[in-house]
């Protein structure tokens, strides 16, 4: 079986000395299956911000999952930090987070069905983004994810959209935002990106959810 992972820098393994220490590789080695890692640093789920026209949004890359035996979609962090659009609703269009998540869920169900997909939400952390409306990675833009971003949304609002919309399509969700045991002071390199211990924690959480659902 091949497990495909669609994600951002966390799925890519940003900051790790060895990419094989990333959560996706840890899961696939443990399960003895093939890994297809489609993590790209800085990418949003919506066609917004830096991904408006570059073809790298989750929406634009969703087709990469078509041959997967099981697919994990893990995103939303960059939509919170870097989108140039407010959340919107499912009718707002695919350049707004809610509209993009609705399109992703609708299309992945058509592609794979509900039994071969897991949606994973962001975890609580401390990162650099557009808290002050900036577009650059500056330390002055650092903040906890319980604070509102430039558009007036905290990370939990993005998580709620993921949970609600996935539920509308009967897609299972692993809500890391509500999981206990992750501490960004211990499990990240920089407040956001997981270190080796952080990836081990992710592999445990996500791997358990996959095992419970995969054939």
Which role fits each region the language model picked out?
Residues 101-105, 159:
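Generic structural signal for well-ordered alpha-helices
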Residues 83, 122-215:
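Catalytic His-Asp segment of secreted/periplasmic serine-dependent ester chemistry enzymes
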Residues 75, 121-122:
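A cross-domain feature marking catalytic cores of carbohydrate-active enzymes
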């Amino acid at each position: 079986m091949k497990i495909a992972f669609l994600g951002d820098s966390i799925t890519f393994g940003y900051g790790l000395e060895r990419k094989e220490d990333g959560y996706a590789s840890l899961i696939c080695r443990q399960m003895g299956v093939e890994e297809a890692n489609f993590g790209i640093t800085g990418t949003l789920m919506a066609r917004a911000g830096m991904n408006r026209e570059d073809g790298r949004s989750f929406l634009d890359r969703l087709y990469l999952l078509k041959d997967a035996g099981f697919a994990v979609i893990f995103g939303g962090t960059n939509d919170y930090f870097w989108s140039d659009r407010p959340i919107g609703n499912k009718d707002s269009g695919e350049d707004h987070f809610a509209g993009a998540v609705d399109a992703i869920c609708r299309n992945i169900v058509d592609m794979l069905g509900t039994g071969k997909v897991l949606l994973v939400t962001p975890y609580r952390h401390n990162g650099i983004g557009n808290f002050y409306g900036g577009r650059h990675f500056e330390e002055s833009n650092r903040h906890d994810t319980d604070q509102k971003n430039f558009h007036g949304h905290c990370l939990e609002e993005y998580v709620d959209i993921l949970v609600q919309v996935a539920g509308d399509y009967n897609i299972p969700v692993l809500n890391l935002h509500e999981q206990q045991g992750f501490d960004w002071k211990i499990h990240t390199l920089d407040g956001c990106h997981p270190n080796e211990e952080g990836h081990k924690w992710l592999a445990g959480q996500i791997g358990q959810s996959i095992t419970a659902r995969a054939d």
